[in-house]
Amino acid sequence: KGDISIANGKFGFLDIPGEKSVFIAGPNLNTAMDGDTVLVKVTKESVNSKSREGEVLQILTRGKSIVIGEYQQNDNFGFVRSRDNYKDIYISRKKKKNAKDGDLVAVKLYFWGDSERKPEGEIISVLGDSEDTSALIKALLINSGITEEFSQEVTEEVGKISENIQAEIANRKDLRDLDIITIDGEDAKDLDDAVYVEKNENGYKLLVSIADVSFYVKEGTELNKEAIKRGNSIYLVDRVIPMLPRKLSNNLCSLNPNEDKLTFTVEMHFDDKGKLIKNDFYRSVIKSKYRMTYTNVNRIIDKEDEVINEYKPIVKMVNEMLELSKILRDAKKRRGSIDFELPETKVVLGEDKKIADIVLRKRGEAERLIEDFMVVTNETVAEKLFWEEIPTIYRVHEDPDKAKMLTLNETLIKFRYSLTNIDEMHPGKFQAIIDKTINLPEGYLIHKLILRAMQRARYSNKNLGHFGLASKYYLHFTSPIRRYSDLIVHRMLAKSIEKFIKDKEKDKYMAAFDVISTSISKTERVADKLEEDSKKIKLVEYMKDKIGEVFVARISGMNKNKIFMEL
């Protein structure tokens, strides 16, 4: 039993946690479609590491009733060919809407087909030409059940939220006089986090102030229900689909400069070796002094006079931030945290929504600095909630699967590297190989293979540790505007501080967080795939007029049928 995935409308796979996948040939799908929950009979066991084979016995739950595909017109009727379905979908003349041959369409099914008849449906939306990128991205969203607009109930609820926070400010620690700053990408509008560092004779004081979304988004509201459903914001190549309406994500909650903002602050004191000496947690009000970008902070670090003169009041603090981040990074490395150095491309669109540039996204000291501060903040909050036995949602990354480690080791040995004692895996073993190969020709491939062999991080109501970070306690606290997990953590941290949780409530929260963890882990996977697929659509459009040209490429993977390359 499980959810089936259909590949190219030709065959399917059933993935069952802890077991080998089951391959299902097209004729054995028995009307199952992508995303359906099905009961499968295994007809052939795995041989030589191949998948098992099976057939669908029963459709338990239909994953969706709306299917995306390309419309094909015949004389008196039409068909929609979908990658999510083995059989074409019959469309009568009356139910074709205004679709033309070759259009990308959304079809609502009213008959799923049987052994004698094809599935039947009605076209509910004509998205456009099947090669138009805006139509293809729209199709991605519909196919994943993503709605851009918020319901009228949510919109009305948000409209009633007051922008006046003066009464609340009196209840908070006032940090408005401090030179607190935000550091984000140039195009970021949902500014979650602000930072402040002060060097003293004992070491460093770090304040990380995070937008207090929980002040605005209350449990039991329509807004909260919608946030749970969305789970996270989605950053497509051409747009952002926010978890929260823009009045909150880009305005009330966003830590825009020179505005009073409600925040949740984690105050941490470190010695000069990066050891946490003491901490404090409190609700606060801040007024960010500068909306800094990674680019400008990197230029300050590189000692460029023009930028140093522009941001003179915070230059000393930025340099102290750099000192502290390097100390924290070294401490992370000593305990074995894995740090992948894999190149990432950023697609830049012009006003016509076509690719204007493709740039290699580099991780400079500013990016690392914020990453270091956010990681240590997440760890600090996680450890507090764990030892106080406060229910919450953790970000967990489990130990690698032994079978995958054995396969990885076979490849590493061919490159004259190896993992020792696979029964006792430690992240430091992987980091040692990464360090050795970082500047070698085979380094890129080895780092990718190690990454693919890792488990996928997920959310859980149980603290299972974070293997990649070598952390005993970890969660997500620092981005509540765009991740629902962080909003949960804020609420539970508030209960911890205010001693506002009774023992009999803990079981209720644990059960609720178990369900929510599963849901938001799934919405995160959907968002990641949508973000990657939308980028691929634009890249394919960009390469259309380059057919026949010769490029230097790097082989990034292969199987018995294909070789994958990166330009």
Q: At which residue positions do the language-model features occur?
A:
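Feature marking long nucleic-acid-engaging regions of large polymerase/nuclease enzymes
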Residues: 25, 107, 184, 191-417, ...
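Conserved, well-folded catalytic cores of nucleic-acid-processing
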Residues: 31, 41, 59-63, 108, ...
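Short coil/turn segments at secondary-structure boundaries
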Residues: 138, 152-156, 173-176, 278-282, ...
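Hydrophobic core residues within well-ordered beta-strands of beta-rich domains
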Residues: 38, 262, 549-551
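Short, surface-exposed charged micro-motifs
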Residues: 3, 68-70, 194-196, 267, ...
